[in-house]
């Protein structure tokens, strides 16, 4: 499910097995080189869908008020629960995933990791994003959680502006194959401010800091609270 420039969204009681992302929340899908390749000499677009992209780019539709709950996710390749990276300078806020189960995730690379992920990209801002009461089974690969700055799928090669108020609460991973989760700001300006982690467990053991074997938090993440 790709939700593009949507607001006031509820997803509940679904079972999803997808090759790509199970649920992704973004501004719109497209890259500058694609738009250029489908623009005629008179300035018209040869792909009709680009008119939608152009309209959204001009009007800056913010993305907010999502609840994704009571779902079971299996992703053969990509993320299970993703916010970003296509943002195009708009604001993402008030997004909550809760009471979901992850059966499978196999994506283990340096750009797109994370059964749960926030990709802070494309000049967007990201605020009040929560993952709560999530069970992650012994996935084949990838990370349980990842929040980081990237310019993947960014129209102008831009990273995100900032992120704040990210919550992980009652996250239970059981298994041995997931690689360590990470939360990474990019620099002093492009930072993550306000992270709350409560009862994040790996094989029943609580994760209590950001420098252990299961979670890395870098110096550009501020105001981190472990509950």
List where the protein language model places each region.
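Extracellular/periplasmic carbohydrate-active domains that bind, remodel
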Residues: 1-227
């Amino acid at each position: 499910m790709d939700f593009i420039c949507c607001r006031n969204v509820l997803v509940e009681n679904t079972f999803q097995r997808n090759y790509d992302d199970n649920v992704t929340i973004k501004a719109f899908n497209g890259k500058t080189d694609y738009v250029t390749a489908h623009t005629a000499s008179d300035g018209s677009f040869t792909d009709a869908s680009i008119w939608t992209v152009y309209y959204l780019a001009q009007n800056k539709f913010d993305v907010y008020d999502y609840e994704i709950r009571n779902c079971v996710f299996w992703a053969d390749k990509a993320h299970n629960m993703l916010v970003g990276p296509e943002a195009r300078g708009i604001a993402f806020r008030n997004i909550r995933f809760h009471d979901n189960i992850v059966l499978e995730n196999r994506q283990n690379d340096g750009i797109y990791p994370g059964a749960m992920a926030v990709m802070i990209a494309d000049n967007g801002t990201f605020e009040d994003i929560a993952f709560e009461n999530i069970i992650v089974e012994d996935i084949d690969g990838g990370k349980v959680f990842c929040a980081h700055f990237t310019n993947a799928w960014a129209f102008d090669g831009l990273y995100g502006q900032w992120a704040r108020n990210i919550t992980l609460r009652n996250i239970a991973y059981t298994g041995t194959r997931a690689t360590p989760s990470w939360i990474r700001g990019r620099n002093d300006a492009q930072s993550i401010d306000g992270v709350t982690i409560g009862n994040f467990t790996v094989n029943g053991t609580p994760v209590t800091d950001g420098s252990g074997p299961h979670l890395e938090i870098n110096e550009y993440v501020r105001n981190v609270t472990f509950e």
